[in-house]
Each structure stands twice: as C-alpha cells, then as structure tokens.
C-alpha cells in the first residue's frame, strides 16, 4: 500500500508545502482536502474518489474547490466526501456559498456517526480527536498485510 503525502503545512501553504492532504492512490482515498489536492489528478488510479475529512477548518477543506477541475479533466464514476454532519454542513453553507465559490463540483456528501462503516473492501472506524472545534481521526482496515518473514530472521 502506497501512501502519498500531498500536504503537511499548517494553516496556510507556502512555497514548498501545501496544507493537509494525504492520498492512498490504489484505494482512491484522500485524507483531508487541503491545498495539496491540486496534485491529485496525476495520482488517481481508479474511477472513484473518497475524501475523508477530519474537520472543517479551511486548511483541511479548501482543496474541495479543486474538485471542479478534477471532475472536468478526469472521468470519475463517483466522488464522495465523508465527514460528520456538522463538517459537511459547514462546507455546504460556507465554502460553497454564493459569495465564496458559487459553482459546486459534482460530488456526494456522506455523513456518518462514530460507528464503523464500509467503503469498497475497507472498514473505516471514525474516532473523535482533541482539536479546537472538534476533529475526527480514521482507522482503515483494508485486508492488506505485508510479508514480514524476512524481518523475523534478522
């Protein structure tokens, strides 16, 4: 399983770093939608994209506006943004407001509680984290295991 770090900067990007965005290309999973989302198109492997948001602070969601370009240049069967209800409502109400970004890209929003849910072959377990305004962390169980027998012989 390959994990690609697209952004790790704090509240705003700088010349060398984008804001929070991590991708697992072979699953089409993205963790947080910071400004690193602008590099997503080159890394997409399949025809689905699932974005898991930790919270609604701008450095974690601004990249959702880049979905407009991605949906035009890539033929994706489905784009789903996952988050708790309050996070998704804040995005719909504020980020995609008429005054800020009046064109909403074509994607579904899927709200969840803290109960585990499934996307494809992966079981996702959300868990609350300590962060101003609240935040969600994720555990992904995707049936992936490494062959480690060589390590045990060392």
Regions found by a protein language model. Give the residues of each.
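Binuclear metal-dependent hydrolase catalytic cores
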Residues: 1-147, 154
């Amino acid at each position: 399983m390959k994990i690609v770090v697209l952004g790790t900067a704090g509240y705003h990007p700088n010349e060398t770093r984008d804001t929070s965005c991590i991708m697992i290309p072979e699953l089409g999973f993205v963790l947080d939608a910071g400004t690193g989302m602008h590099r997503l198109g080159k890394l997409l492997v399949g025809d689905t994209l699932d974005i898991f948001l930790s919270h609604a602070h701008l450095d974690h969601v601004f990249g959702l506006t880049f979905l407009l370009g991605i949906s035009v240049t890539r033929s994706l069967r489905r784009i789903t943004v996952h988050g708790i209800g309050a996070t998704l409502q804040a995005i719909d109400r504020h980020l995609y407001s008429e005054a800020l970004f009046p064109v909403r890209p074509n994607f579904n929003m899927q709200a969840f509680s803290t109960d585990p849910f499934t996307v494809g072959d992966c079981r996702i377990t959300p868990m609350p984290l300590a962060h101003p305004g609240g935040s969600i962390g994720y555990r992904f169980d995707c049936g992936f295991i490494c062959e480690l027998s060589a390590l045990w012989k060392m």
